[in-house]
């Protein structure tokens, strides 16, 4: 067994480090009134509660649970994705629509209502600054899109002007699964 020679300097350093631990732990705690974001568990749903038939597939965008549910046309594939959701109920259009167009590397253009609030906003070409991320699936409602995002902090939060945003890798997956004509319900 080795003989450990501890000096007074080692002893003081050890005690000092121990005294710092509680302060660093307190720095990591959340205030009691904070709310959770990016919830990691979702309840599964049944497509029959929303649609009379699967058609080319079905999507439910749930603004309360902040999740997107996808069912394939044959009903064998069911997936749940965390999403960003509209900031307010006024920005949330609810009801039935469908995917009418899809685009890899979409460009973003501010809507007329956004330009009223932010007249300096300019269109953004595809790339890392684009708020639509890497893929976009346009709905039959003007200016409503299921898309990706480069800002992953938005997922699980109320952060959009009406769209539903997914992590870029998840929108790429959904983009491959959901063809044009996929039914969409926003609740």
Describe the role of every protein-language-model region:
Residues 20-21, 180:
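Residue-level marker of structural boundaries
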Residues 8-9, 67, 165:
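Short, cationic motifs built from Arg/Lys/His that form the positively charged side of catalytic pockets
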């Amino acid at each position: 067994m080795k003989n450990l020679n501890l000096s007074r300097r080692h002893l003081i350093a050890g005690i000092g480090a121990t005294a710092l631990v509680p302060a660093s732990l307190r720095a990591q705690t959340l205030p009691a009134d904070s709310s959770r974001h990016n919830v990691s568990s979702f309840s599964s749903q049944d497509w029959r509660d929303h649609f009379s038939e699967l058609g080319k597939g079905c999507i439910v965008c749930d603004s309360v649970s902040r999740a997107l549910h996808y069912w394939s046309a044959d009903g064998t594939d069911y997936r749940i994705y965390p999403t960003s959701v509209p900031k307010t109920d006024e920005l949330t259009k609810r009801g039935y629509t469908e995917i009418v167009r899809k685009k890899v590397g979409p460009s973003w253009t501010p809507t007329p209502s956004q330009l009223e609030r932010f007249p300096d906003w300019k269109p953004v070409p595809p790339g890392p600054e684009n708020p639509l991320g890497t893929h976009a699936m346009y709905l039959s409602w003007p200016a409503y899109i299921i898309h990706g995002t480069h800002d992953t902090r938005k997922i699980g939060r109320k952060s959009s002007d009406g769209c539903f945003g997914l992590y870029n890798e998840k929108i790429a997956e959904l983009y491959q699964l959901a063809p044009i004509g996929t039914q969409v319900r926003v609740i």
